[in-house]
């Protein structure tokens, strides 16, 4: 079965079995909602077990979750550093123009017909996502995911068309 990373357990939260998760999910509210089925992978990326979310809340930059049958700090401390993943079957359907992060990572980024680089990471600093574009011989380009910049995302052809606003690329 194919799995996709949605978060990393970075610490415990309190004594009642809550976990502090650093989310890398494109749909965190949906992914961590009560009843969601996820898979737990250890620090060597080996499958450990299926888990079910019983509660979720946001706190600062973290998602605080509690898993079924894990109700005390002693039961969850060993999972620090583990990864939560969603199976391909549990991803859900997307609306027109929506896509998953794993579909964007690795896409070629073009301005007109000039290859700029490849999306290597997606950051979530605030109001909009920022795509980190790996370029050859240059520093990474931070590309805001906003309509004036990202013109088209062609998932089947793994291509992103952009128009770089003045000042966005400080190496040109």
Curated annotation (Swiss-Prot):
Keywords (A to Z) from UniProt: Chaperone, Cytoplasm, Ribosome biogenesis, rRNA processing
- Per UniProt, residues of the PRC barrel domain are 96-168
Top-level lineage group: Bacteria
- Spell out the InterPro entries in the cross-references: PRC-brl_dom, PRC_barrel-like_sf, RimM, RimM_N, RimM_N_sf, Transl_B-barrel_sf
* Gene Ontology annotations for the cellular component aspect, listed alphabetically: cytoplasm; ribosome
Provide a Gene Ontology MF annotation, just one: ribosome binding
> Does the record's keyword annotation contain Heme?
no
Question: Is Glycoprotein tagged as a keyword?
Answer: no
Matching entries from HAMAP family are given as: Ribosome_mat_RimM (MF_00014)
Regarding protein family, the annotation reads: Belongs to the RimM family.
Free-text comment about domains: The PRC barrel domain binds ribosomal protein uS19.
Q: How does it assemble?
A: Binds ribosomal protein uS19.
Q: What does this protein do?
A: An accessory protein needed during the final step in the assembly of 30S ribosomal subunit, possibly for assembly of the head region. Essential for efficient processing of 16S rRNA. May be needed both before and after RbfA during the maturation of 16S rRNA. It has affinity for free ribosomal 30S subunits but not for 70S ribosomes.
This chain's protein is named Ribosome maturation factor RimM
- Give the species this sequence originates from: Streptococcus pyogenes serotype M3 (strain ATCC BAA-595 / MGAS315)
